[in-house]
């Protein structure tokens, strides 16, 4: 049962990330997210990095409370949130934005589609008119474009 809860939580987090990105990061908390689009911060860290902590808190709380209370489902939820956060970090910060110079030379169609969709998202420098707010699920048109490009 705990494995099912973990997997369900992991995939549910894609919806949470999409919703939060579209309505919170590009809404009420745009002041934290804006420098991620405009690259106005000259240093390594961005105000946008605060979202790492904001998203980490529920994962940590669920993991610690689930573990200390012996509530396995809550522990699994915490691990699912944390696993999604780790994947988000690898895909978004490492693979897409190359904040760390790992995973640079992949030729995988799916990963290229993720990169293409995110690039489209970053074409919008304001909080309005955005698109592609998710991370791991990309609109089919980007996957299709990469499949067609790989056949050439």
Predicted regions located by residue number:
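N-terminal signal-anchor transmembrane alpha helix
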Residues: 1-20
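Cytosolic/stromal cytosol-facing helical appendages immediately following the last transmembrane segment
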Residues: 2, 12, 27-51, 65-74, ...
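Hydrophobic, membrane-inserted alpha-helices
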Residues: 56-63
């Amino acid at each position: 049962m705990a494995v099912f809860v973990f997997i369900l939580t992991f995939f549910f987090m894609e919806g949470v990330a999409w919703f939060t990105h579209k309505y919170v990061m590009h809404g009420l908390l745009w002041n934290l997210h804006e420098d991620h689009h405009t690259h106005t911060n000259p240093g390594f860290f961005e105000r946008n990095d605060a979202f790492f902590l904001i998203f980490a808190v529920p994962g940590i709380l669920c993991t610690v409370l689930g573990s200390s209370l012996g509530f396995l489902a809550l522990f699994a939820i915490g691990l699912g949130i944390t696993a999604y956060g780790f994947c988000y970090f690898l895909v978004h910060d490492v693979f897409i934005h190359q904040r760390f110079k790992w995973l640079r030379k992949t030729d995988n169609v799916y990963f290229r589609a993720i990169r293409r969709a995110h690039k489209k998202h970053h074409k919008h420098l304001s909080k309005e008119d955005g698109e592609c707010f998710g991370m791991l699920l990309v609109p089919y048109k980007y996957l299709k474009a990469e499949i067609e490009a790989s056949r050439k």
